[in-house]
């Protein structure tokens, strides 16, 4: 039995210099799992709660000592002696003990760190890589694929101090034959984009997710400079590289209107903003749009799905917050056709796997995602491969908190070879 003998929680620092929770789970036989919780900037209102101390004298109120105390106290007491291989039971014990709908007693950051650390320790005790253990937990042993990356090379919105309203402009190296080649194409376009921006006298400082964060004349200009970079890098837009956007529209939804401050405070209704996006998809090969409307604008989302849903992938992030109850409602109402998967929106590995399964069973795609506040923890790489999710969103080609995930994917691809196909654009809904 992979019995848990010790659990340690500690406060560490994330990629934004804010504290987060790290957990260590020790098993009989000396096996250890180590995992850290990420943290978002543009968060959905229905996400599981990230517990912060609120003590302004430490880390400006962002300390996580309460969550760490939960790991070292009640959580440790509850899971010590339990079998780490029984992930569903470990997660259920913590969720039941917390006793709240949104994990506000211990914090999703505490529960998630222990959940992932337990999975890593269990994988070690079985003598297998984490992705292989995840595939077994998922009920799909031995079924793997390498995800198509969505690389966020221009950051706006809450991820950058610039005038760009749309939060992420991404490239997908769909012409690649392997994940490793996709990373190379992404890197070449990223570096070429720096040249394009410099030639225009624009900033090449990077945002939270490692993409450039220049001030631009409009949101469409972000697409134009990326298109120029793709061409200059020697690739064909639409064939070798496609585009994706995360609007994070909740962040610019004010009094029932979508207000683009970077475009002279232009205001749109749900229908108008849908057609604004539709026009962009006619000008550029955009194959995926995330959170194209506010998380509460379900009528608008239904309309957007009717207009765009058969042509492109419409991903719900703040809309669904990796929550099966909310996703189920979305599936029943025909809202969006894809879900963004973020561990810490729901707060445990078991619930994350349930959301991926529900999406796939309904014909929705699942995009595995980082958060804007990350650590060197690369678990999402193993999650993407182990669930054969097909797509991953883990930032740009800079900042080691982002690159850690790409490097882990490169290692996994090397280990699995033909057992983990890279399916490229075929993974994207509507393509």
Swiss-Prot record:
Main location: cytoplasm
GO biological process, one term: glycolytic process
Top-rank EC class of the record's enzyme: lyase
Molecular function via GO: magnesium ion binding; phosphopyruvate hydratase activity
Gene3D superfamilies reported for this sequence: Enolase-like C-terminal domain (3.20.20.120), Enolase-like, N-terminal domain (3.30.390.10)
Pfam family, one: Enolase_C
Assigned keywords, A-Z: Cytoplasm, Glycolysis, Lyase, Magnesium, Metal-binding, Secreted
GO CC terms of this entry: cell surface; extracellular region; phosphopyruvate hydratase complex
The protein's annotated pathway: Carbohydrate degradation; glycolysis; pyruvate from D-glyceraldehyde 3-phosphate: step 4/5
Reactions accelerated catalytically: (2R)-2-phosphoglycerate = phosphoenolpyruvate + H2O
Residues involved in (2R)-2-phosphoglycerate binding: 167, 342, 371-372, 393
SUPFAM superfamilies, alphabetized: Enolase C-terminal domain-like, Enolase N-terminal domain-like
EC numbers, comma separated: 4.2.1.11
Cell membrane recorded as keyword: no
Function in brief: Catalyzes the reversible conversion of 2-phosphoglycerate (2-PG) into phosphoenolpyruvate (PEP). It is essential for the degradation of carbohydrates via glycolysis.
PANTHER family for this protein: ENOLASE
NCBIfam families attached to this UniProt entry: eno (TIGR01060)
Assembly mode: Component of the RNA degradosome, a multiprotein complex involved in RNA processing and mRNA degradation.
Protein name: Enolase
